[in-house]
Amino acid sequence: MKLLLHDLSASDAGQYLSISDKQSFQIVGPAEKSPVKCVGCFGCWIKTPGECVLKDGFNHMGEYLGNCEAFTIITQSRYGEFSCFIKNILDRSISTVHPYFVKRQGEIHHKLRYQNHPELQVICYSSDLSEEEKNTFENRVKATAVNLGCSTHSVTFINGLDQSILL
């Protein structure tokens, strides 16, 4: 399975997102309501390992990430960071790791819960990022890839939503 996490509105997704094989994708994007913010309760570690205890339709991200071979994020960036929606969903994905620590790539990180290591591809559609903001964003993606145990990562910058995004 491939996982797509995006922050596009329904109309923008319909207009700019072109997916050749929708059946192979689990698609997570903004819904009718906003996702509940992570409250730091660690219920996804203790009460329902691998699944967020906040049942709002976005609580299965840990399972999706644990079973995907490729993880694509489409996001707008402000100041070199993920959009608020994407950051919120990634925060809610902490269930992909265990609460204890191990050394990975010479750094201390949480032990991975799942054995697969998806490829991470991030497409950033902001049109006014400075070079410093782009560097910050690339570093954020690299850190996210390490935290999620991704095998590879890449970042593509496109100039706003003036072209189709092909997957």
Whereabouts are the PLM-identified features?
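N-terminal beta1-alpha1-beta2 submodule of the flavodoxin-like/Rossmannoid cofactor-binding fold
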Residues: 1-98, 146, 154, 163-167
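Short hydrophobic beta-strand segments
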Residues: 1-5, 119-128
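Short histidine/acidic/glycine/proline-rich micro-motifs that form metal-
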Residues: 77-79, 126-131
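Alpha-helical scaffolding within the catalytic cores
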Residues: 105-109
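Short, conserved loop/helix-junction motifs that constitute active-site signature segments
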Residues: 111-118
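Glycine-rich phosphate/pyrophosphate-binding loop and the adjoining helix
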Residues: 128-167
